[in-house]
Every structure is written in C-alpha cells, then in structure tokens.
Amino acid sequence: MSQGKIVQIIGAVVDVEFQRNEVPKVYHALKVEGTAITLEVQQQLGDGVVRTIALGSTDGLKRNLLATNTERAISVPVGAGTLGRIMDVLGRPIDEAGDVQASDHWEIHRAAPSYEDQSSSTELLETGIKVIDLMCPFAKGGKVGLFGGAGVGKTVNMMELINNIAKAHSGLSVFAGVGERTREGNDFYHEMKDSNVLDKVAMVYGQMNEPPGNRLRVALTGLTMAEYFRDEKDASGKGKDVLLFVDNIYRYTLAGTEVSALLGRMPSAVGYQPTLAEEMGVLQERITSTKSGSITSIQAVYVPADDLTDPSPATTFAHLDSTVTLSRNIASLGIYPAVDPLDSTSRQMDPLVIGHEHYDTAQRVQQTLQKYKELKDIIAILGMDELSEEDKQSVSRARKIERFFSQPFHVAEVFTGSPGKYVSLKDTIRGFKAICDGEYDHLPEQAFYMVGSIEEAVEKANKMSAKA
C-alpha cells in the first residue's frame, strides 16, 4: 500500500502528495496515520498530488502527516450484524454497543443494476393514511418523495409511515439520517426500540453538525446496506424486500454544493454544484427493485422557501414514482397531515392498477376540491349567499372532504393526546365515495375533523348534536 504526505489543509479539503507512479484513483479511501480520519480522493491535480475530502473533523491534522492508500473505496459493514445498530458514514458504531459483527464489507460506490435485472411492480403499498392511500398511492418497490418547506410536517409524516409500514411489514428497514437534527435521530431510535422492531432496522446517521463529506456520503452508506439485503439471496434464491427511509435528500444536495465549492468548481444556477443532476442520478438510479428483491424508498425533500422550482427539489421530482406535496396553506388551517391533494401525484393513478372504484372516487374528490378552489375568490368577495344551490353543495362537500383528509397520528399522540388512527384503503374509499354521493350532507363539517373512518365522523356528529 502506497503512502503519501499531507501538503495542504483548507477546512475539509486536504491535499496529499504521492509518488507519481503510486497516485490513488478517484474515490479511493486514504487513512491518516495516528488519527481516525478517512480521506476520500476527489481530484487528481497532477504531479502526484490528489485533492481529498475529509470524512470527519480535520482538527489536529498538520502538514507532512502520512496518509496510506487503502486501494479501495470506502467500505462499510453489511448484513444481519447491522440490524438494531446506529452507525456513522464509515459504518462505525455510535451507539456504544460494541463493534458491528458484519459478515461482509461492501464498497459504497457501486453501479446501478443492469436493465435486464430490474423489475417493476404494480402492487400497492397501503400506508393507513387516508389522503396518501386515496390521492397518491404508493407502489411496492417504488420511490416516494415527501416535499415540503420548513415546519409543515415532513419528518412527522415520515415517522408515521415508518410506524404504519415498517411495523406491519415483515421485511427489513434501513434509515439514513442525512444532515438532519440529532434529536430526531435519537427519537427515531427510541421509537423503534419501544415498538420492538429495532432488530429489523439498520440506522446510519450523518447529522447537521458533521462535515460536508460525511453528509454527502451517508446516503450512499445506507443505500449500500439496503442493496445487500436486496441482492443477498437466501436458500430459495430470493433476496429481501427492503424499506429505505432517507431524511433528508435536500441535505445530500446541500452537502454536494459545499464539497463542490471547497473543490473550486464553478457554481451553476442558485449556487448549486454543476454536477447536481449527475449526483442525484447516481444515488437514485441505485434505489431500484430487481428480480430477486425490492427496495421501497421514502424520501423527505426539503423545499427551500416553499419554491418547488428550486433546482434541488426540481431535480428530485424526475426520479420519483409518487410525490406527496405538503402545503403551508393547509397546515395553517390546522389540517394535518398537510398534504395538498391537488398537487400530489402518483404513477399508480390508473384504473387498471388501482381498480375503477378507487380511481373514480379519487377523480371525483379532485374535481370537487378543484371547483371549491375556483369558487374561493367569489366567496371571498360576495359571500356564500351569492352561489347557486349546486355550488353551495359542492363547497359544503369539499370542506367536509378537506377535514376528512385530516387524521390523528400514532407518532403525535404525545403532543395531541388523541390516539392515532390507521384507516384501511377499503374504508378510505368507502368514506370518500359516500361524502361525494351526498350521504352525509346533513352532518356538520366539524364532525369530519381529526377522525379515522367515516363511522367515527357519524359518531362524533351524534355526540355534537347530543351536547347541543
């Protein structure tokens, strides 16, 4: 193994000089002697000098320290030994529970599966969240994005999805915390522990306080662990179905921007790295299902200043099967989850995939909400009395639908005091179909707020009339 010496340190960027005939390849990992720091080669500058990004704090590094070329990319532990553990970007345990007992180590830079190995599925993944199941259903083995600005509930929605899917799902889950709050990572660990599913979850964290190199690579570390579970065949020749949760994809892009600036690349639109589309593609193309197993991924995507045309969320859109858009306007009405049913999409929205009843109900709900949206200006200027009877009925049903989309979450029980509700897809379709048919026109709209199934809304209305 060749050795070089550090010649320059600028923040997280470290230049290392090697003999000209022993220059490491791009993405090879270097170990710095006397420290726990790993460097990843990003550029070859010529004359035997390589420019690297430090995966860890560069405090205490100095010139002329020796760096050894490991002659391979960063490798992380994979397999059953990672389950129930919290690891950093290099696969080192950070949960103070001893070493990770891994059967194998895989490099984090890998090629995406070939076209002939990939497979697509039209099987629906029920989430128990009414607005998602009805308006933007998820596919098993698909990619889902939760888009939203600051404070509209991306992480809470993701935690509820983990609660509803990962606990009911008998397969394995991998959670990659990319540049998010350490507190949320801690909460997630205890949530999994309390619900006895910790032994089915591998957790990889590169949080807000870590250098950009860690935040840029931690998503790849988590993905590599998920790929192992998908590709490693059991006795029957099948891999596993894996859930991959990434919170937050925007921080992955942001870390790429920081690294790009540190490496001296010319920024492109809004200051992002010129390689934004390529970096996103490298990650997203690997998150796919093969003939042996599947990866279903749910990714939170922060939307800077609520602008969906920002290059980062706009680049992410192209890779997803379902997009769940969280709206600040809906959150301001106190309707949670604050999903915008008119702005959320799904490739599964096809009568041949989800069935005619589901498709027709979703279309009717969408038309009713769209009509209400168009009438809002008239109502604001002239008031409800100026509307025709038909329009009044549409507005009344739309307001009931809006409120019926709200739902108490299991993960928010501690804040709200009301028990969480899981609503099956069948009950969801039945409830919204009945509202559109006018079966509940006589009930007050408050009865539909924060309930589970339609029966609970009727019960709530009866209680309200009894009190009155």
UniProtKB/Swiss-Prot annotation:
InterPro entries on file: AAA+_ATPase (IPR003593), ATP-synt_VA_C (IPR055190), ATP_synth_F1_bsu (IPR005722), ATPase_a/bsu_AS (IPR020003), ATPase_alpha/beta_chains (IPR050053), ATPase_F1/V1/A1_a/bsu_N (IPR004100), ATPase_F1/V1/A1_a/bsu_N_sf (IPR036121), ATPase_F1/V1/A1_a/bsu_nucl-bd (IPR000194)
Topology versus the membrane: Peripheral membrane protein
Gene Ontology molecular functions: ATP binding; ATP hydrolysis activity; proton-transporting ATP synthase activity, rotational mechanism
UniProt keyword terms in alphabetical order: ATP synthesis, ATP-binding, Cell inner membrane, Cell membrane, CF(1), Hydrogen ion transport, Ion transport, Membrane, Nucleotide-binding, Translocase, Transport
Matches recorded under CDD domains: ATP-synt_F1_beta_C (cd18110), ATP-synt_F1_beta_N (cd18115), F1-ATPase_beta_CD (cd01133)
Entry binding sites for ATP: 148-155
Residue intervals passing through the bilayer: none
Domain of life per record: Bacteria
Protein function: Produces ATP from ADP in the presence of a proton gradient across the membrane. The catalytic sites are hosted primarily by the beta subunits.
Family in the record: Belongs to the ATPase alpha/beta chains family.
Record note on quaternary structure: F-type ATPases have 2 components, CF(1) - the catalytic core - and CF(0) - the membrane proton channel. CF(1) has five subunits: alpha(3), beta(3), gamma(1), delta(1), epsilon(1). CF(0) has three main subunits: a(1), b(2) and c(9-12). The alpha and beta chains form an alternating ring which encloses part of the gamma chain. CF(1) is attached to CF(0) by a central stalk formed by the gamma and epsilon chains, while a peripheral stalk is formed by the delta and b chains.
PANTHER family from the UniProt entry: ATP SYNTHASE, ATP SYNTHASE SUBUNIT BETA, MITOCHONDRIAL
UniProt-recorded name of the protein: ATP synthase subunit beta
Organism: Xanthomonas campestris pv. campestris (strain B100)
Gene from which the chain derives: atpD
